[in-house]
Amino acid sequence: MQEKLKKLIGDNINFVFVGEAGSGKSEISINFAKWLVQLQDKPVHFFDMDMTKPLFRSRDVEVQMEETGIICHHEKQFMDAPTVVGGVNRLLKDEDCYVVMDVGGDHIGARAIGGYAPKLNKDNTIVYYVLNAYRPWSNDIDHIDGTLGQILGVSHIQLGKLHMVNNPNNGITTTAKEFIEGSRKMSEMVTPYIAVDFACVREDLYEEVKDSSDVPVFPVELYLTYPWLQNDLPNGQPVPGRG
């Protein structure tokens, strides 16, 4: 896993996750930060930039994240009042640490990083656009292009900075078959225009699907689960990942 990650990130130290709401950005960004911690070469700072929703926020599992060694940054949110997280500019310039930014969904969430564009467009940063073929605005290339264009417009991220992540899932009930079919569909849609860097799958499905994709597959541990999600599972099964 570590060698695969090192090859993926190269010399980059800042990693930003954007995409459609519900694409799985937060779960992936949390896991990505955890993988960086496991490299044991630099401290990892995690910024929760999401101001768009009250649930499925990385800040809600801050304790679990810090137990893995991640240094968390966020601001408390009241209703829909906008908040600005401190320390972003300083740490984006620090070459002795990694920075991971979890950005809110769609163009509404992406507005939060527009002011950091001059730093995010530098050579030491990767902006990951998370794609989920099972989301309504990612099921065809026209919808993907429309959502992507809106996000780039408000975030001021250069198109050339974008790297694609394939995250085909239907939540905690996702099957291996759904991952394989969603991964294939997304690859057929986007790879004629831009390469996909890697794919993510729920960790209990990893062994079953790891060789099914033409890009590296990374196993994702679920952090942002809630007890009521268990109602979606048959026969009272426990929620995969952290309950």
Residue ranges of each PLM-predicted region?
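Long hydrophobic alpha-helical segments typical of transmembrane helices together
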Residues: 193-243
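Switch II (G3) loop of P-loop NTPases
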Residues: 74-78, 96-112
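N-terminal phosphate/diphosphate-binding loop that engages ATP/GTP or pyrophosphate donors
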Residues: 34-82
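The conserved Walker
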Residues: 21
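Conserved catalytic-core segment of NTP-binding enzymes
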Residues: 108-213
